[in-house]
């Protein structure tokens, strides 16, 4: 049986940087907190917990004083930085550069009032800032925070009809969303916006993420069985897993090697192991080793 790990799977640049910063700080000693799960993968979070990383939420952050806190790749709204400064917290900012640039673009757009900037009706003339993303996702909360909570989040094409097409619309996207669906949303808004109103779209989807879709399709198509390894909280993982299943119905989502049902291997010649941008390489390696060392009963 041939078993292959997808070379393109594994941590994206932003996650790699965040984890490296955490490991460096932990190796230097002292207590380090992380605001939210550093990555949407329970096995990797547990590995870092054993190294000493303490995961906290925003309520915990309000109670901390003089601590050292790492901000993960997803980014945070301005209020988090203000609270940290108020509480004397030392921030280690691991926000992904792609997310950081997007935050700055949205903030700049929000602060620009169309026209001559005359006082009185600026709020009424401000265009709608729309973000294609998952409501409540950490990255999306950070993006909405750049607009003091005024940005409108659309989770899918079905949500777009509730926009006010009599006002200007500026469309952005969460960096890990589907490029295909983003284009469908663009087409819908173009078809419905009223004459004389401005619509501008900004393709802010991370290319490292977007390029994974065609790559994972091709990988899934050339194997009899696909083991997709990722945490079940990963938005990016769900998109990629669904894409694998569309190409290869013999695809299974697992969080670790312990979840492999070896009956799946019956009659299989080739197995492909792949994962999300939040899946550590070591976890896929363990799945490969589990398959290599598996001996069916009677063949030991």
Kindly label every feature range from the protein language model.
Residues 1-300:
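The feature marks the mature, well-folded catalytic cores of soluble enzymes
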């Amino acid at each position: 049986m041939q078993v292959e790990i997808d070379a393109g799977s594994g941590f994206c640049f932003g996650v790699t940087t965040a984890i490296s910063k955490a490991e460096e700080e932990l190796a230097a000693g002292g207590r380090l907190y992380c605001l939210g799960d550093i990555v949407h993968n329970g096995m990797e979070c547990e590995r870092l917990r054993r190294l000493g990383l303490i995961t906290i939420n925003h309520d915990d952050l309000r109670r901390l004083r003089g601590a050292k806190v790492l901000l993960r790749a997803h980014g945070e709204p301005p209020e988090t930085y203000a609270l940290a400064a108020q509480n004397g917290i030392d921030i280690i900012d691991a926000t992904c550069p792609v997310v950081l640039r997007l935050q700055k673009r949205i903030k700049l757009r929000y602060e620009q009032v169309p026209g001559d900037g005359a006082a009185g009706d600026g709020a009424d003339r401000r265009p709608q800032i729309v973000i294609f993303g998952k409501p409540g996702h950490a990255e999306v909360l950070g993006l909405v925070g750049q607009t003091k909570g005024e940005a409108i989040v659309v989770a899918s094409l079905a949500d777009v009809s509730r926009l006010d097409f009599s006002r200007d619309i500026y469309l952005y996207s969460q960096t890990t969303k589907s490029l295909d669906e983003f284009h469908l949303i663009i087409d819908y808004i173009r078809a419905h916006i009223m004459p004389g109103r401005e619509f501008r779209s900004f393709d802010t989807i991370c290319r490292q993420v977007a390029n994974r879709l065609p790559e994972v399709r091709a990988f899934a198509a050339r194997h009899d069985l696909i083991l997709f390894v990722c945490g079940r909280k990963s938005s990016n993982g769900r998109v990629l897993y669904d894409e694998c299943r569309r190409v290869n119905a013999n695809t299974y989502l697992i969080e670790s090697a312990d979840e492999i049902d070896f009956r799946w291997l019956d009659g299989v010649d080739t197995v492909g192991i792949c994962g999300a941008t939040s899946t550590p390489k070591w976890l896929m390696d363990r799945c490969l080793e589990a398959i290599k060392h598996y001996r069916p009963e009677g063949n030991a």
